[in-house]
Amino acid sequence: MVMQEIERGNVAENPSDDEVREYAHALADQIEQSGFEPDYVIGISRGGWRPAIDICLLMKWKPFVTIDVKKAEYGRIVGENPHINRASIKGQSFLLVEDMFETGLTAKGAKRFLESLGAKDVKTACYFARDFAEVKPDFVLRDGVTHEVFFPWERFRK
């Protein structure tokens, strides 16, 4: 009954910590099966931090860094994290991680930023992507989501 309501968009989904761990395992498996081996796993602040850390741990300790993408009126402003410098970006491959692609524009802005600095390959991953997302992730567990999803780390936000 609840899944039918979720599929119709009538109920918000609140995955538990255990479910989120299962998502991380499934997404890490999907990425590994594709053959993509990033040099860095990047969590896009804030929703991507926890999924990126979990995936990073599951993918044999790939270096984890964060990137801050702020929404601006005319696009995305990307801030660099002090632990990743421009010199270490050139020629490297990156996995950008979000919890959910609403529009996908945040990840698109971060990807463009890394590519402009010479990144060799940049792929995106998320647990869920909304049905109206303008940009589709390279790796996703559930695409075309029509309902709200509140992850455990969002429950503490005001």
Regions found by a protein language model. Name each.
Residues M1-K158:
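PRPP-associated nucleotide enzymes
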